[in-house]
């Protein structure tokens, strides 16, 4: 006989022995029930009903990120002559962050204004010529062509003057950007330049963040999204603060799921008035939904059903009694079902023992 055949025979013998054992065990249990002998139940087979607060929990995992942040860029091409802040410095709204060299910018304003003044003078002269040619034309001393040429000169100079005035405004605006100030109070999170450095237009200078309020960007499975609502509270634990929780609330929910993970982004806002938290800290939390206060919930396996409806088996004076129940909410993550018709302190069979029937005498191990 081959080794494979021997293994198959051994497996068959084991399966046959197991099946016989189960049948004999069930037969003994049924025989005990039929003859009124008490059935011995383990402590794990029963539970005592207690009132408790229940809720579904959605796990939130993510990193803290400042809600308000601003990346400042240079709006002029110039040399940095003053840079009074470093990474980590706390600044207030209006504080000076960067000062650029103003000489070239001031010269640009002066030059544009001089050009605008010259065009303004030329325009006034052209307008006077147009007025004189118009009067002469009315007396027949000047032709219509002369008047039209003078009018064209006026219109052209006026257009040039408007363009030059716009250049003056641009130069003045650039001069006003020679100082970069904080738009809001916060902390310098990054700095990309050094004092004395000449930077071109639109160079990234630094990033400022506000730490009073942070958020967690968490991905929640689509199956759990129907449980989530705006303003729901969340209890968060943050790395570096063992034993302490921080409160947050649902601020925003993305309208679409991520194509790859099939998760929906949920943003949890967290107050940080103490200033303890920092961007990038890893956090884990539980979002409690569908809170139910002072309810009795039993394991789903304890709920039985017959032609008369749902019921549980209550151990009363050493005998199993049928207790009809109504079903409420369920908490699938804990395999519990809210029930009515059961009182606090009732001892209920919670193990899946289908052979147990009403009026069966039982004893509970260790009691």
UniProtKB/Swiss-Prot annotation:
Source species of the chain: Rhizobium meliloti (strain 1021) (Ensifer meliloti)
Sorted UniProt keywords: Nodulation, Plasmid
Gene3D superfamilies given in the database record: 2.40.30.170, 2.40.420.20, 2.40.50.100, Helix hairpin bin
MF term (GO), any: efflux transmembrane transporter activity
One GO CC term on file: efflux pump complex
Protein name: Nodulation protein NolF
Family: Belongs to the membrane fusion protein (MFP) (TC 8.A.1) family.
The keyword Electron transport appears for this protein: no
